[in-house]
Amino acid sequence: MNLPLQQHGELPRAARSAARGGSDRSGHAPGVLRIAFGIVSLFAGGGLQRNCLAIARILRRRGHEVVIFTSRLADPLPSDVAIEVLPNRAWTNHRRNLRFAADLAEATESRFDLVVGFDKLSGLDVLYCADASIAARSGWRRLTPRYRALRALEAACFAAGADTRVIALSPSQIEGYRRAWGTEPQRVALLPPNIERERRHPQHRLDGTRERRRAALGLKAEDWCWLAIGRQPRTKGFDRAIAALPAFPTARLFVVGLAASEPAAGPVFKLARSLQVEDRVKFLGYADEEIPALMAAADLLIHPARNETTGTVILEAVVNGLPVVTTAVCGYAAHVRDADAGVVVPEPFAQARLLAALGEARDHRRASEWSANGMRYGERPELYSG
């Protein structure tokens, strides 16, 4: 992974000094940066959280010292990266973010050369930005305390004249922030697509893995297996996928990243029951390491998200030969078009358009073409360079 803001000319002053071998604010070895990462919630299974941990490990391998600060540690995580929890008693998410920003500033003062945020926070040297601009939203939500709090944190990073350098993940994301804030182009760097090579296993569709995993899932030969991945049901459009099930009697939906026992799964099950398709929906919980094999077992990645800056699972599906049906709001939907590996449902979203896309994906010959196209697309080295 190439970190685009590591050039000395773009680092904050103390970090440039340390990187050149001069003195720095924490007094450690010349050439070594002491870097603080800030992320509000740290848990297994989240894409942002996985990227945070991966980047921390890369920087550690390069000899730098990294400490991850978080307000909430939801799962046991590997001990190879230092993690400090800053207790936070806020009752709402937006107040939690505000409190965490203040706590992070206090905890890192004079201790670190570089403070990197994985959420929009005040006082950051660098922001790894994984979501869209809240300032661009319209309607009644702009009147809420939540909106005002999150907008203030966004302004601290993106308003014209701010000092924070930004790592962005898609061109459309950058454009959205520039329209909202007039963010200076020289403060923003675009991170190329990046998927881990070890998550690409197109051979699993041909070497018997597909058949073994389908049998383990209880799938019959005639079952049309849809795979959905994520922890935020509404954001990822799980309800849209379930609403499509009645139109396709042989379809079965498997959800990775969310367990049936979690509160967030409740509304999804309620919708499935109301449509009498609950027997065709199964939650597999957190199964990140199994995703390549599950992609081999599946016939389709269904990802009708409402909001998705990138959508790494989209690109992972493409390179693993799994046809994709997704929405145009997803940053990585462009790879589905470029590879000719599925269907991108245009905006504004309509359920009828999703049903039409699924009808196209049901054609076995077309789906086979998409699968082969995705496997070829996955041979491009630039997909693994971010």
Give the residues covered by each predicted segment.
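A charged, aromatic-enriched C-terminal amphipathic alpha-helix characteristic of glycosyltransferases
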Residues: 47, 365-386
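Short alpha-helical donor nucleotide-sugar binding micro-motif in glycosyltransferases
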Residues: 286-287, 293-298
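Membrane-proximal helix-turn-helix segments that form the acceptor-binding/catalytic region
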Residues: 147-167, 174-175, 181
